[in-house]
């Protein structure tokens, strides 16, 4: 027997999706494989998803896999690589508490006296629709069905039918939906799930309906006892597949409570299963109120992926009497507004306008090329493993793919992918990219990424073993097939080739020879292909660092694989808990190595990127910019934040930071240096076109202040528009800011404003400012930083003096557009 010991790396514990993936990995072997959770002293058949879930395994639990059988050595090698490298990817990223914390109710809403019910935010957003109550199904009628001689046959038929339905949905879905449906399919195909139902029928003589329900109750009770919220919330998945089985078995008894949404609807239910959610017309699903759903349920994951706002914590009996009435579900402030009046509806129309502006601006920002504050260009690219990930990466602002892990095509299968399959996969991502560069890393297999059909013998130290470019000569046919596929696809886009695990010049010379042979073959075969291709290497073996100058004669670029390079440089296994604290790329030795690579490559006109985890770490971005890297490639969700941060950094200041870091004596000194590093704040003018509006159709004072504060949030002048608005209202309550002549000047000095601003809205028609000075049709809002030297009283006074001048006022009211107002104010005012 062989054993793999590890700490559970899953933040949410061993729930349905990772259990399904682990079961799939284990099921391909003849050996018996037992999963053990040592904290719980729980054992499970690793080829059963349900048994794995039942171990109650949480993050960082001490676990092991015991493997015993004829193929135990090969199984251990492959499963160890899976546990160490890919197991964590089967978990899902959950929203932070900050993302699920409701904003305090803004004054611009509370002053309108809305009829509100308060709940808890589960998925952020705002939805407007009709409240519709969905009653829960009762299972009592199924439990009462007597046992029948046909029950066993019925069970097998229902399981097969449900599996067929799920497989059909899998063919039609992608993303989170596909992942969750796969987990459900795994559960119904699980021997333990169906076996328990059969035992209840044979040993306890229960009818099929009662056996399905009793099995559901037993499994749910075990999950409900878990210490993990995430595992407790898998109860919904067990209930979902069990109820589907019941409805398939007796469709005539009672149709499932499916709802047809014919107009925008806010759905109110005790709970909603994933399959019920997927059956809804999402175009008309404005939001959901779910009484008992937790923040990590699969239904919530689907809702967030579909941008459906969700609240909980509202008792159904408190909402039932409002069924059929219009409402606004505000999952930003955590409220449900019942029967909103015109003023409340107007508030949410303004909120939607701001949300649309924000979404448009984010899309524009993502599409912009990445520059530092002083216009130093740096490419921001994505790391992906399949062509399906490419559109999402580009939507996040990826300017290309810095690492396409082609080995994913070779893994988890019985035979190698042929040339046509590879060509189609590579062509798909190139077509999605347009003219964006795609760097294909040739197959990094062998060693820690064992491929059974290659029959590479087991190694004592696979991370330092027979892998990547080292295996290519033995498997030259396999490598040539990949080269042919990439060269064919390269004729459809900007393809580049990167070779992993290179340690010497002879390897790259051999590869270049193979590329030329592949080109000759493709010409001979009359297949469309690229005549040349940009070639680079992964810099992950320390020996390469000392001969970068020689490699510059043979390749076009370098990409530093910081994960493996860190391990090899320090001789540290990052998966070994006894030495993993030593795994830290931010040390003087590592930074000096990066500096040497970049300097040598740049001297010879070659570019250098980084494609390990380090590339997406925002804390270390100033160092990477300062070291002169030309490209950062990272997980695509990190791209928007990295681009935004980069725009705030001055490359010269970062270069000095990197120089100082390389002179430090320890990692602790570098961390202290980073903590003390404060990027110079970009300076924005007090007056700017982005904050000036004409002919705004506001119906009240509240909408004007709401819009102007919210717009400052959209434009990045504040990260806290709700808090800034509160400061404006507090000043407004001391004395109204109407100054006469149809003008109001709301103002505040606030800690929540990042860039002091003057915002202007000239209204389409006057509004009541609740002031003795009469109605207002021009709003000039001053928001100055609390710690800035600018005196808001002086600014206010200068504006007031100008407004006394009739000609100045008339010019403001007569201005044709926002630019005319800006030009007038810049001419007349001095701050």
Swiss-Prot record:
Its main location: cytoplasm. Residues 685-828 form the PTS EIIA type-2 domain. Phosphoenolpyruvate binds at residues 405, 441, 563-564, 574. Residues 119-650 are annotated as: PTS EI. The active site is at 15 (pros-phosphohistidine intermediate), 298 (tele-phosphohistidine intermediate), 611 (proton donor), 747 (tele-phosphohistidine intermediate). One of its GO terms (molecular function) is protein-N(PI)-phosphohistidine-sugar phosphotransferase activity. Its EC number is 2.7.3.9, 2.7.1.202. The modification Phosphohistidine is found at residues 15, 298, 747. Keywords: Cytoplasm, Kinase, Magnesium, Metal-binding, Phosphoprotein, Phosphotransferase system, Sugar transport, Transferase, Transport. Mg(2+) binds at residues 540, 564. This is Multiphosphoryl transfer protein. CDD domains: PTS-HPr_like (cd00367), PTS_IIA_fru (cd00211). PANTHER family: MULTIPHOSPHORYL TRANSFER PROTEIN 1-RELATED, PHOSPHOENOLPYRUVATE-PROTEIN PHOSPHOTRANSFERASE. The lineage of its organism: Bacteria, Pseudomonadati, Pseudomonadota, Gammaproteobacteria, Enterobacterales. The PTS EIIA type-2 domain is phosphorylated by phospho-HPr on a histidyl residue. Then, it transfers the phosphoryl group to the PTS EIIB type-2 domain. In contrast to classical PTS systems, the fructose-like PTS has no requirement for HPr and Enzyme I; FryA combines a IIA domain with an Enzyme I and a HPr domains. It catalyses: L-histidyl-[protein] + phosphoenolpyruvate = N(pros)-phospho-L-histidyl-[protein] + pyruvate; D-fructose(out) + N(pros)-phospho-L-histidyl-[protein] = D-fructose 1-phosphate(in) + L-histidyl-[protein]. Pfam families: PEP-utilisers_N, PEP-utilizers, PEP-utilizers_C, PTS-HPr, PTS_EIIA_2. It comes from the Bacteria. It comes from Escherichia coli O157:H7. It is found in: Cytoplasm. Belongs to the PEP-utilizing enzyme family.
């Amino acid at each position: 027997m062989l054993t793999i010991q590890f700490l559970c790396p899953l933040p949410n514990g061993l729930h349905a999706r990772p259990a399904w993936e682990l079961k799939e990995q284990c099921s391909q072997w003849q050996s018996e494989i037992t999963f053990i959770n040592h904290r719980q002293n729980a054992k499970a058949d690793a080829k059963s998803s349900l048994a794995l879930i039942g171990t109650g395994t949480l993050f960082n639990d001490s676990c092991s896999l015991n493997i015993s059988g004829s193929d135990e050595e090969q199984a251990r090698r492959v499963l160890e690589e899976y546990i160490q490298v890919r197991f964590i990817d089967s978990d899902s990223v959950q929203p932070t508490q900050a993302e699920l914390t409701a904003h305090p109710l803004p004054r611009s809403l509370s002053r309108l006296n809305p009829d509100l019910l308060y709940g808890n935010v589960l998925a952020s957003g705002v939805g407007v629709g009709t409240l519709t109550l969905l009653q829960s199904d009762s299972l009592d009628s199924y439990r009462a069905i007597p046992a029948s001689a046909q029950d066993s046959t019925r069970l097998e038929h229902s399981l097969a039918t449900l599996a067929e339905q799920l497989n059909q949905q899998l063919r039609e879905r992608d993303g989170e939906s596909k992942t969750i449906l796969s987990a459900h399919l795994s559960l119904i195909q699980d021997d333990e799930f169906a076996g328990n139902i059969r035992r209840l029928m044979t040993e306890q003589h229960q009818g099929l309906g009662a056996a399905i329900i009793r099995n559901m109750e037993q499994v749910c009770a075990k999950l409900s006892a878990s210490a993990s919220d995430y595992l407790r919330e898998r109860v919904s998945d067990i209930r979902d597949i069990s109820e589907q089985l019941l409805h398939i078995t007796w469709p005539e008894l009672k149709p499932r409570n499916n709802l047809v949404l014919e107009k925008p609807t806010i759905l109110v239910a005790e709970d909603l299963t994933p399959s019920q959610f997927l059956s809804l017309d999402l175009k008309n699903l404005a939001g959901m109120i779910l009484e008992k759903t937790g923040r990590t349920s699969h239904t919530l994951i689907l809702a967030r992926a579909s941008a459906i706002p969700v609240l909980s914590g509202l008792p159904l009996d408190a909402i039932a009497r409002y069924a059929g009435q219009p409402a606004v579900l505000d999952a930003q402030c955590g409220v449900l507004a019942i029967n909103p009046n015109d003023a409340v509806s107007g508030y949410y129309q303004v909120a939607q306008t701001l949300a649309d502006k924000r979404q448009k601006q984010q899309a524009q920002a993502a599409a912009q090329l990445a520059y530092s504050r002083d216009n130093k260009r740096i490419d921001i690219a994505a790391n992906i493993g399949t062509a399906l990930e490419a559109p999402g990466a580009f939507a996040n602002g990826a300017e290309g793919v810095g690492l396409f892990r082609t080995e994913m095509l070779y893994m988890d299968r019985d035979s190698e992918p042929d040339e046509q399959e590879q060509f189609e996969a590579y062509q798909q991502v190139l077509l999605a990219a347009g003219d964006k560069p795609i760097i294909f890393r040739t197959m990094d297999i062998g060693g820690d990424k064992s491929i059974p059909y290659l029959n590479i013998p087991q190694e004592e130290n696979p991370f330092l073993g027979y892998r990547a470019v080292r295996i290519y000569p033995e498997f030259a046919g396999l490598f040539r097939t990949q080269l042919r596929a990439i060269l064919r696809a390269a004729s459809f886009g900007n393809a580049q080739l990167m070779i992993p695990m290179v340690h010497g010049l002879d390897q790259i010379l051999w590869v270049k020879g193979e590329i030329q042979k592949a080109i000759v073959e493709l010409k001979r075969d009359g297949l469309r292909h690229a005549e040349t291709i940009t070639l680079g290497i992964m810099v992950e073996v320390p020996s390469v660092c000392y001969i970068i100058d020689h490699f510059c004669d043979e390749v076009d670029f370098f990409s530093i694989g910081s994960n493996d390079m860190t391990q090899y440089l320090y001789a540290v296994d990052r998966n070994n808990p006894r030495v993993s604290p030593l795994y830290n790329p931010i040390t003087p030795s590592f930074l000096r190595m990066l500096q040497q690579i970049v300097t040598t490559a740049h001297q010879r006109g070659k570019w250098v990127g980084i494609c390990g985890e380090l590339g997406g770490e925002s804390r270390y971005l100033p160092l990477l910019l300062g070291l002169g890297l030309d490209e950062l490639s990272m997980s695509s969700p990190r791209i928007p934040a990295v681009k935004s941060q980069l725009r705030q950094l001055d490359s010269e200041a970062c270069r000095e930071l990197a120089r100082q870091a390389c002179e430090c004596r320890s990692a602790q000194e570098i961390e202290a240096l980073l903590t003390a590093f404060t990027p110079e704040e970009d300076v924005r003018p007090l007056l700017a076109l982005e904050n000036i509006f004409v002919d705004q159709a506001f119906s009240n004072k509240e909408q004007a202040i709401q819009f102007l504060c919210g717009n400052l949030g959209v434009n990045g002048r504040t990260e806290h528009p709700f808090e800034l608005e509160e400061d404006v209202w507090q000043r407004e309550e001391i004395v109204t800011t109407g100054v006469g002549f149809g003008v109001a000047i709301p103002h505040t000095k606030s800690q929540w404003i990042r860039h002091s601003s003057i915002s202007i809205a000239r209204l389409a028609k006057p509004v009541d400012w609740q002031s003795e000075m009469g109605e207002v049709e021009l709003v000039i809002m001053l928001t100055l930083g609390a710690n800035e030297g600018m005196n808001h009283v002086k600014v206010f006074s200068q504006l007031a003096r100008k407004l006394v001048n009739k000609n100045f006022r008339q010019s403001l009211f007569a201005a044709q557009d926002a630019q005319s107002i800006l030009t007038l104010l810049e001419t007349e005012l001095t701050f």
